């Protein structure tokens, strides 16, 4: 008999060789009908795979992230089977699950392919799904695997096999299709009830622009037809909220081919939005004891060699800049933390000085392939709201708790109320990916776990997702459409203080290493703004709106009074514009609604005679007429409410 520990802590005994599906059946038939795979000792397995020793087991369904991923990976295989049946001779690259479904890279040879083919392929996928063919795992020798794909004349699978060791190779078969794959997969194709092919694009084999361009087909599947309908409805709403579309309409940012791909240009309204976000966080940081610092956009290569960033991110960096006479190598700054370490070292530190909190809105640069760039969410130059806290070991937990408070304050003010904290730990089976001693990692991981529990955060733990220098706490925020985004992050780091030989004099008059905390409530400011735009559909809170008011004179003769009102509001830092176009007031109101300006101040003869303004809120609510002084008071009280959370 073997002992199986379930997520609720209960322990059950089973015969050796029990499968996860067998465990599910022992609990209830209803559960078994929904089990897609299982997490066995932290590793995702097929539900049909035998368990031969004491293990912890989590049964995975569609409601689990890993369950969805397995479902979509299996769907990619089913898509490949349909393509092979419809287009004999097709060659296949890779077909992974992604965050929003799956794709398969395909070589159709000389055959032209377009979205016009989607309907026939979808029908074939559903036809094959109804056959309820099992996904069967098989291990064979590398020699036999090479022989199989040589016979099929599939150069891409042979290329993949070249990079694998000479041990056993895993194949998966469903129906008439066999693929090279580690798995895992769902029990059978019958779980797949709805399919939608979303788009087609070109993709170079292995991401190498010198290799052949394959056809990448994106798709998504669901266990119920209604879930597909709901998903497509959300997609339509997402198109309306797309930050690239709204960014252009609201005149926030732009891109220029001459400036370079992935390098956003912030227009006046967008720059004002950024400035307000930065000032909001800067004020909160002052209250929390942070000190501002500023570092250059480039750094000597040796700085990043010392920090370990060059070895880790060198391939993602731009080429070095060489000084013409000294021959030094400089890199565009990929991270702010090495610079902050050097600031710490500018003078001796005592235990009485700690914690020291340095904060900077620092722009960093990473090389991303052109195909990976996407609006503001994936760029080559971005600004981090970076802060680094240098503290004593006994202060780590307290400082971590304070940072959690700051992150949650930011989220609450900006309306992100649905979030999960992801505790990202080191993979104990793959320690070579990380730097540092085991004892330091254990201390850091324990500090994060305890602080998260103390704050009552809803958490998930992910092995292998830690930064190379330490564990971290990432906040996974759900937006208005239910999509998850990784925004704020907090990291404990015992490694950089060692690499930079940071010291402080302790109460024992001896030298000690400080602990370093990395924190960024926004993360990338560009990415945060993109998510915020889509979350609020461009309807920013009053305090954050680039244009907070629009003054709409009914005719030209009221322009002087409109200017007077504008000047009085500007003194109070109330920003906006005067629409003095020769247009009817109805058109001015409609145009202002499209611009999502929170307040419209309409001025006609009555308002001029009474020294007032007629106030209309975005969305159509009429607040009547007010004296300018009364409006200022009302405006300021509205902002105070939004910031007092």
From Swiss-Prot:
PANTHER family assigned to the protein according to its UniProt record, in alphabetical order: THREONINE--TRNA LIGASE, CHLOROPLASTIC_MITOCHONDRIAL 2 (PTHR11451:SF44), THREONINE-TRNA LIGASE (PTHR11451)
One GO CC annotation: cytoplasm
Annotated binding of Zn(2+), by residue: 337, 388, 518
Family membership: Belongs to the class-II aminoacyl-tRNA synthetase family.
Main location: cytoplasm
UniProt-listed PROSITE patterns: AA_TRNA_LIGASE_II, TGS
Catalytic activity: tRNA(Thr) + L-threonine + ATP = L-threonyl-tRNA(Thr) + AMP + diphosphate + H(+)
Domain TGS: residue ranges: 1-61
Keywords on record: Aminoacyl-tRNA synthetase, ATP-binding, Cytoplasm, Ligase, Metal-binding, Nucleotide-binding, Protein biosynthesis, RNA-binding, tRNA-binding, Zinc
InterPro entries: aa-tRNA-synt_IIb (IPR002314), aa-tRNA-synth_II (IPR006195), aa-tRNA-synth_II/BPL/LPL (IPR045864), Anticodon-bd (IPR004154), Anticodon-bd_dom_sf (IPR036621), Beta-grasp_dom_sf (IPR012675), TGS (IPR004095), TGS-like (IPR012676)
Cofactor binding comment, as recorded: Binds 1 zinc ion per subunit.
GO terms, biological process: threonyl-tRNA aminoacylation
Superkingdom to which the source organism belongs: Bacteria
Subcellular location: Cytoplasm
Known partners and oligomeric status: Homodimer.
Stored SUPFAM superfamilies: Class II aaRS ABD-related, Class II aaRS and biotin synthetases, TGS-like, ThrRS/AlaRS common domain
Region (Catalytic): 242-541
Molecular function in Gene Ontology: ATP binding; metal ion binding; threonine-tRNA ligase activity; tRNA binding
Source organism per UniProt: Cytophaga hutchinsonii (strain ATCC 33406 / DSM 1761 / CIP 103989 / NBRC 15051 / NCIMB 9469 / D465)
Full protein name: Threonine--tRNA ligase
EC number(s) reported in the record: 6.1.1.3
Gene: thrS
């Amino acid at each position: 008999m073997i002992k199986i520990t379930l997520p609720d802590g209960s322990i059950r005994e089973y015969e050796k060789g029990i499968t996860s599906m067998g465990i599910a059946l022992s609990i209830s038939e209803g559960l078994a009908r929904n089990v897609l795979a299982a997490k066995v000792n932290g590793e995702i397995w097929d539900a049909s795979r035998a368990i031969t020793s004491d293990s912890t087991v989590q049964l995975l369904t569609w409601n689990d992230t890993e369950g969805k991923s397995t479902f979509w990976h299996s769907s990619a295989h089913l898509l490949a089977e349909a393509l092979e049946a419809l287009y004999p001779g097709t060659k296949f690259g890779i077909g992974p699950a992604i965050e929003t479904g799956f794709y398969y890279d395909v070589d159709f040879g000389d055959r032209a392919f377009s979205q016009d083919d989607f309907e026939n392929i979808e029908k074939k996928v559903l036809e094959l799904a109804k056959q309820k063919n099992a996904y069967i795992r098989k291990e064979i020798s590398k020699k036999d695997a090479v022989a199989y794909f040589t016979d099929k004349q599939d150069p891409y699978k042979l290329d993949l096999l070249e990079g694998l060791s000479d041990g056993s190779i895993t194949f998966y078969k469903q129906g008439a299709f066999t693929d090279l794959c580690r798995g895992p997969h769902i029990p059978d194709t019958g779980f797949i009830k709805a399919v939608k092919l979303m788009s087609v694009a070109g993709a170079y084999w292995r991401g190498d622009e010198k290799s052949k361009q394959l056809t990448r087909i994106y798709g998504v599947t669901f266990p119920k037809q209604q879930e597909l309908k709901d998903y497509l409805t959300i997609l339509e709403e997402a198109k309306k909220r797309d930050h690239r579309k709204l960014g252009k309409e609201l005149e926030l940012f732009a891109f220029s081919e001459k400036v370079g791909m992935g390098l956003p240009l912030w227009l006046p309204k967008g720059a004002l939005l950024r400035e307000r976000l930065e000032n909001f966080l800067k004020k909160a940081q002052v209250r929390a004891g942070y000190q501002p610092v500023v570092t250059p956009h480039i750094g000597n290569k040796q700085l990043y060699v010392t920090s370990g960033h060059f070895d880790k991110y060198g391939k993602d960096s731009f080429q070095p800049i060489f000084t013409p006479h000294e021959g030094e190598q400089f890199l565009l700054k990929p991270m702010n933390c090495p610079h902050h370490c050097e600031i710490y070292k500018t003078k001796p530190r005592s235990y009485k000085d700690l914690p020291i909190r340095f904060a900077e809105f620092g722009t960093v640069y990473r090389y991303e392939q052109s195909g990976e760039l996407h609006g503001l969410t994936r760029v080559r130059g971005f600004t981090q709201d970076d802060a680094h806290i240098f503290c004593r070991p006994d202060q780590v937990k307290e400082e971590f708790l304070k940072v959690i408070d700051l992150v949650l304050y930011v989220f609450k003010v900006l309306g992100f109320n649905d979030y999960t904290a992801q505790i990202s730990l080191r993979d104990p089976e793959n320690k070579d990916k990380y730097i540092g001693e085991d004892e330091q990692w254990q201390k850091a991981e324990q500090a994060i776990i305890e602080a998260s529990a103390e704050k009552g955060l809803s958490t998930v733990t992910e092995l292998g997702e830690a930064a190379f220098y330490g564990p971290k706490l990432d906040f996974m925020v759900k937006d208005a459409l239910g999509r998850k985004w990784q925004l704020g992050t907090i990291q404990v780091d015992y490694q950089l203080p060692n690499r930079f030989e940071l010291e402080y004099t302790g109460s024992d008059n001896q030298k000690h290493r400080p602990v370093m905390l990395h924190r960024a409530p926004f993360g990338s400011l560009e990415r945060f703004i993109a998510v915020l735009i889509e979350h609020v559909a461009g309807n920013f809170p009053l305090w954050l709106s680039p244009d907070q008011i629009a003054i709409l004179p009914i005719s030209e003769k009221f322009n002087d009074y409109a200017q007077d009102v504008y000047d009085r509001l500007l003194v109070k830092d109330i920003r906006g514009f005067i629409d003095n176009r020769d247009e009817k007031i109805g058109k001015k109101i409609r145009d202002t609604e499209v611009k999502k300006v929170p307040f419209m101040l309409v001025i006609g003869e009555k308002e001029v005679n009474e020294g007032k303004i007629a106030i209309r809120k975005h969305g159509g609510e009429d607040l009547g007429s007010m004296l300018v002084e009364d409006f200022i008071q009302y405006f300021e009280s509205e902002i105070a409410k939004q910031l007092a959370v």
